[in-house]
Amino acid sequence: MSTIQIRRSDDSDVVSAANDYHSNMAIQEITVAELHEILPNIVLVDVRETDEYVSGHVPGAVSIPLSTVQDNIEPFLAHKPTYVICLGGARSYRACEFAEQNGAECINIAGGTGAWIQSGFDVVLGELPNS
């Protein structure tokens, strides 16, 4: 009877592979100060919900709530790169991950609209999405 030897990787191999995968999938980010410098010459998508968008958004931002990104991927694909913002950076990061998995090139805005407002930059109030 023959025996089969199974080699088990130690945990460091698994952690290293996971880190390599994550670093290859990392989403690019810029600060709100960097965003301020390049506006209005970019496409900026705000993935907050409509009521959040209407309560104050970065001038020129287009509203595509995160809950609808899957059905509205075209704007992400039409412009390379597409800049994506939310309130703090987490939802926009998720939107970027989804869009990039579908062929888009996205840049997340670190700190989001909250950091934009804290920096004292102008916001647009009360405007309907995409108007």
What are these regions (language model features)?
Residues 84-85:
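Short, surface-exposed ligand- or partner-binding patches at beta-edge/loop junctions that are enriched
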Residues 2-43, 49-81, 91-131:
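Rhodanese-like catalytic fold shared by cysteine-dependent sulfurtransferases
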